[in-house]
Regions:
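Secretory targeting signals
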Residues: 23, 27, 31, 72-75, ...
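Hydrophobic/aromatic residues in alpha-helical transmembrane segments
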Residues: 84-91, 103, 139, 173-174, ...
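Aromatic- and glycine-rich beta-strand/loop motifs that create alpha-glucan
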Residues: 1-23
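Transmembrane helix boundary and interhelical loop/hinge segments in multi-pass membrane proteins
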Residues: 88-108, 122
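Terminal transmembrane helical anchor/hairpin motif
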Residues: 11-14, 28-68, 189-262
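Long, hydrophobic alpha-helical segments
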Residues: 71-96
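A structural motif at transmembrane helix-loop-helix junctions in multipass membrane proteins
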Residues: 165-199, 203
Length: 262
């Protein structure tokens, strides 16, 4: 518990900044919808004529004339990519920063096992992601009520947030596992994982031959068009993502317990 609290306090400014920026951007996106609504049908027609471009971003199956169609795309742009980058950075720096800042030896001299250290740091990462998503969801919910779109507060609305929460957990856990193998740096790796998964999803939407990539990227189960239409999450992709998460965490725990830290 002490490690959890210490790590969370240590990362409070990063959490505050990321939460504030994502909440502000997505909140503004919601609040300007009434001004954008008259042009949304024209945008739907425009995107319909753009072929593979709209398919790549999953916009070919959404109706921008409805709030949920608009919000699903904007949520993916802001919370999807922004949250993925936050999760990647938070996960990758969790373990490596001790060696980078030369505090690892001091930390490990305390009467706690390496397993307890890793568990505490992992719980801190998960707690930070949970806080960010709860705040963002709260801000967006208040924004939807403020613009008079209460009818949009359906299962699909909250499932979008659940999907991106799971995405961030998966990316954070994968980068957390990777961080056990690193001695310094890591931020570029965390950003690379976030961007990499994002572009893999775009590629998987372009051709049928690339659809297999959907089983690799967590963005596959965050497709707004699928969630809005079916009011459900794509369980097969989530299951595969859970398996990748477990493998990364097990590998990270196993290696860090045996790692030569000097």
């Amino acid at each position: 518990m002490k490690i959890l609290l210490h790590e969370t306090k240590r990362s409070r400014w990063s959490l505050l900044i990321w939460t504030a920026v994502i909440s502000f951007m997505l909140g503004i996106t919601v609040l300007i919808y009434p001004e954008m609504a008259p042009q949304m049908n024209e945008m739907t027609d425009m995107f319909a004529d753009m072929g593979s471009f709209t398919a790549a971003f999953g916009m070919d199956q959404l109706n921008f004339g409805e709030f949920m169609g608009y919000f699903a795309v904007e949520c993916g742009n802001v919370l999807g990519l922004g949250g993925a980058l936050f999760a990647g950075i938070t996960g990758i720096t969790a373990l490596v920063k001790e060696e980078r800042d030369r505090t690892a030896e001091f930390l490990l001299t305390h009467p706690v096992s390496r397993t307890e250290v890793v568990k505490g740091k992992l719980l801190s990462v998960l707690a930070q992601i949970s806080v960010l998503n709860l705040v963002v969801m709260g801000v967006c919910t208040l924004g939807v009520v403020a613009i008079g779109e209460k009818a949009a507060l359906t299962a699909a609305f909250f499932l979008l947030f659940l999907a991106y929460y799971l995405l961030q957990l998966e990316i954070a856990c994968i980068t957390f596992g990777i961080s056990a193998f690193l001695k310094k740096g890591g931020v570029a790796v965390g950003l690379g994982v976030g961007f990499g998964f994002y572009f893999l999803n775009i590629l998987s939407n372009l051709t049928e031959e690339a659809e297999v990539l959907k089983y690799i990227t967590p963005f596959a189960y965050c497709e707004g068009s699928y969630i809005v239409e079916n009011k459900a999450l794509d369980i097969p992709y989530i299951t595969v993502g859970g398996g990748l998460t477990a493998i990364a965490l097990i590998a990270g725990f196993w290696y860090y317990r045996r790692k030569d830290i000097s």
